[in-house]
């Protein structure tokens, strides 16, 4: 059961956060030639790119993944990572995806997240899926 799908750049910050969560997850590939297809409803975990603006905030691999109508139809919520140095642009990728895909923006965390973020996301993801049934 893969209930989380995530993207992580070569910095691996989001990957480390997912590893610490200890929940089943699938990774959107870094390389364009590789594809991931969702096979059940999922929550997307995504980093925010750029310097706080809207342009370029959502990684192109995530855009390509969500441009697949099948993948987009199974999206149920979004969690975003960001850098508070970007001010109002903090976790902007989550805002953009939630708005465009009409799903809830469930949580935001900075960089690799804290222990409290890990606890909050574990609890929040569990409660979210319980409410979906």
UniProtKB/Swiss-Prot annotation:
GO molecular function: FMN binding
One GO term of the biological process aspect: protein modification process
Residue pairs linked by disulfide bridges in the UniProt entry: none
Family membership noted in the UniProt record: Belongs to the NrdI family.
Described function: Probably involved in ribonucleotide reductase function.
Protein name: Protein NrdI
Organism annotation: Cronobacter sakazakii (strain ATCC BAA-894)
Lineage of origin: Bacteria, Pseudomonadati, Pseudomonadota, Gammaproteobacteria, Enterobacterales
UniProt gene name: nrdI
């Amino acid at each position: 059961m893969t209930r989380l799908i995530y993207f992580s750049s070569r910095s691996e910050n989001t990957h480390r956060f997912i590893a610490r969560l200890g929940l089943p997850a699938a990774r959107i590939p870094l390389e364009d030639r590789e594809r991931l297809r969702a096979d059940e409803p999922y929550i997307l975990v995504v980093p925010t790119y750029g310097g706080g603006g809207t342009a370029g905030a959502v990684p192109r691999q995530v855009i390509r993944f969500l441009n697949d109508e099948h993948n987009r139809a199974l999206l149920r919520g979004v969690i975003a990572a960001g850098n508070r140095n970007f001010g109002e642009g903090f976790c902007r990728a989550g805002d953009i995806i939630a708005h465009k895909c009409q799903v809830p923006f469930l949580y935001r965390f900075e960089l690799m997240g804290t222990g409290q973020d890990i606890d909050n996301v574990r609890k929040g993801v569990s409660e979210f899926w319980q409410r979906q049934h």
